[in-house]
Amino acid sequence: MGYVGVCHKVYVCGMIRVVKHAALDSGRWKGLALLLFLAAAICLASLLSGGSGISARQAVAALLGAGDEAARNVMMEVRLPRLLAAFGVGGLLALAGVLLQALFRNPLADPYVLGVSGGAAVGALLAMITGAAAMGVQSAAILGALGAVAVVYLLARGGGTSRLLLTGVVIASACGALVSVLLAVADSGRLRGMVFWLAGDLGWALNPWSSLLAAVLAACLALLVARPLNVLAAGELRARSVGLQIEVWRTALFIACATLTAIAVINAGTVGFVGLITPHAIRLAFRTSDHRLVAPASVVLGGTILATADLLARTVANPRQLPVGAIMALVGAPIFIALLRRRAA
């Protein structure tokens, strides 16, 4: 093959690669548009559905500040705050899952499975029982989550999937035992509310706007550090070869995961499997592990998933309300088992 033939072959291969990348990028944009449409549809369904007997026309009027006072109270004091809390908490848990999976280099890492949510719950409950202020409860939850993720990392480091999951089970069990002890000594007047909160309840969100704002800010920060996350997820050898300060980044990820999980637990209790399901779904749908896409898309999908679970929790057993954590466990447990079997195969 002459020089002209070689140049022609290189040109053809290059054009094929450009076309493939263009088609892939086009598919990803379409996927993002579909994801945003799905999120908008769930928002609309969540705002218009419930057991209060409010029609769609009344709901829209109430959101616009018109209509009767009862409808406005239901929309502005119940449905809208729950929707905001669902998207905020779901986004936080999904992003925590993304960061944990990058930290442990394991697709089965999740705040709930590894006991990080349990650690945050222990810290928050302990602060509540001792009469701490809101800032004290938040700080205790972050410390509890940070302690749990640090213990899991130290015990499961380099041990593979089985060791990671076993360590998570042990930490989660220990946190569950501590929660039981704290509930046993808690004031009986607050016991029912604490139990329902622990099962996952968006109705207890103290400030739904704060969780949503935290999720948006966290997604923006994740975009800024997406490239180091990609390098860290590729392994220590790759990270050291490009001069990445591994221990600094690990410490930062510890703190970030603990903070995200703690904010979610404070607002909604222990809700599981959002951080496990969401990153997997995004990677499969977009056929990429690039955190520049996975992190922000996971925040949107995580919020959508939890908003859907909350919609089911409010409407399936109407007029009774189910814990949103129970809905997520019923959906997430079979998916977790399927992923575990797939990884073992």
What are these regions (language model features)?
Residues Y3-A345:
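Alpha-helical transmembrane segments in inner-membrane proteins
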